[in-house]
Amino acid sequence: MEKINSNSKVDIAAFIYARSDSVRLPRKVFLPLGNESIIEVVLRRAKACLVDKVVLLTSDRAIDDELVEKAIKLNYEIIRGDSKDLIARTLNAIEVIKPKQFVRINADSPFFEPRLLNFILEKNLNYDVITNLLNRTFPYGVAVEVINCNYYKAMAGVAMENEKEHVTQHIYRTINNA
């Protein structure tokens, strides 16, 4: 865990899930997109959303140290955790940051749309999960996920071992089976 200042009240946090390695395209979050790296674009776009705090969630592996250094340099908070258990990393972030809801944003999705997310957040809807990923009609990379933290904590126990590498797969499995 690094650079956390949780003195201020946080209703909605944007959790940016990032790692430096990728099987298909290693270090893709550092690739340029215009005048910035992809991770810089994602962090900037997240900051434009109606959230109280933007936090980078990454692994505790040395390969992600450069990513952490970049986020610190840009003045973002960081939560580090197990590279294979994103549910545990998310639960840790919820415990440290203490938001009521969190927005999930993937660091390799520079085209996620802040206006779409803000449209949802402006409604101030009190649901367990708000998403456009079920019965997908939006293009890939334009995902919206807003999750109630109490619901997420309650649902963490239903995750199967193979779902721990994913932030919300266990939730969608239970929704689809309902």
How would you label these PLM feature ranges?
Residues 1-25:
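N-terminal nucleotide-binding beta1-loop-alpha1 segment
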Residues 38-54, 69, 73-74:
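A short, N-terminal amphipathic alpha-helix
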Residues 61-123:
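Short phosphate-binding loop-to-helix
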Residues 112-178:
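Conserved core of the sugar-phosphate nucleotidyltransferase
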Residues 11-16, 39, 53-56:
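Hydrophobic targeting segments
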Residues 31, 35-38:
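Catalytic alpha-helical scaffold of carbohydrate-active enzymes acting on polysaccharides/glycoconjugates
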